[in-house]
């Protein structure tokens, strides 16, 4: 499904990004953590899959004429606000940014660690669910508390929806049980 993004005019004062999926009548919104400066991996992943011309198209669909230059400027502002601003609560810039293989900075939020690492050799039949469970456990170990599981599932659903395979209810339960099992092993 083609996903399009429409942002509120002033992202800095907004607490939501509004996503438009498929039909013009299909709307849903997602809260941005910490006043728009830190977002979950799901939103980052979605943003990285769309280009600034999607913003342009979305504005046109919304009845607001937009030039390509304006769309590019807005897209750059969005990327700056979401990915380059640091929060005062962050421990250090070194812990937030890691160098990837290409030498560019990759921002890592608490939810990004849930999805970016490979599962261990002990992988059950459904590696997708096992990976999600593993990342949840890693989050618990790293931050000393469990993430809001519903947020983790929602984040995973956004990523998976892009590929056409959202989690089913029974899969969510499987992940929850895997997390409990993995925690008991520790």
Swiss-Prot record:
Keywords: Early protein, Host cytoplasm, Host nucleus, Host-virus interaction, Phosphoprotein, Virion. Phosphorylated on serine residues in the 115 N-terminal amino acids. The keyword Transmembrane helix does not apply. GO terms for cellular component: host cell cytoplasm; host cell nucleus; virion component. It is found in: Host cytoplasm; Host nucleus; Virion. Induction: Expressed in the early phase of the viral replicative cycle. Disulfide bonds: none annotated. Its main location: host cell. The keyword Coiled coil does not apply. Belongs to the asfivirus phosphoprotein p30 family. Oligomer. Interacts with host HNRNPK. Modifies the subcellular distribution of heterogeneous nuclear ribonucleoprotein K (HNRNPK) and may contribute to modulate HNRNPK functions related to processing and export of mRNAs during ASFV infection. Necessary for virus internalization. This is Phosphoprotein p30. The lineage of its organism: Viruses, Varidnaviria, Bamfordvirae, Nucleocytoviricota, Pokkesviricetes.
């Amino acid at each position: 499904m083609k996903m399009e993004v429409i942002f509120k005019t002033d992202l800095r004062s907004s607490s939501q990004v509004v996503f438009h999926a498929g039909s013009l009548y299909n709307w849903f919104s997602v809260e941005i953590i910490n006043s728009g400066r830190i977002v979950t991996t799901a939103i980052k992943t979605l943003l990285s899959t769309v280009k600034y011309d999607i913003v342009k198209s979305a504005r046109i669909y919304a009845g607001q004429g937009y030039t390509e230059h304006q769309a590019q400027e807005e897209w750059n502002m969005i990327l700056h606000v979401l990915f380059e601003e640091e929060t005062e609560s962050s421990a250090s810039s070194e812990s937030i940014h890691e160098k990837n293989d290409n030498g560019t900075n990759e921002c890592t939020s608490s939810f990004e660690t849930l999805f970016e690492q490979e599962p261990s050799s002990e992988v059950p039949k459904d590696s997708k669910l096992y990976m999600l469970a593993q990342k949840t456990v890693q989050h618990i170990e790293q931050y000393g508390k469990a993430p809001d599981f519903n947020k983790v599932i929602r984040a995973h659903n956004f990523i998976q929806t892009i590929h056409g395979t959202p989690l089913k209810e029974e899969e969510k339960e499987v992940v929850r049980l895997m997390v409990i099992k993995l925690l008991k092993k520790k």
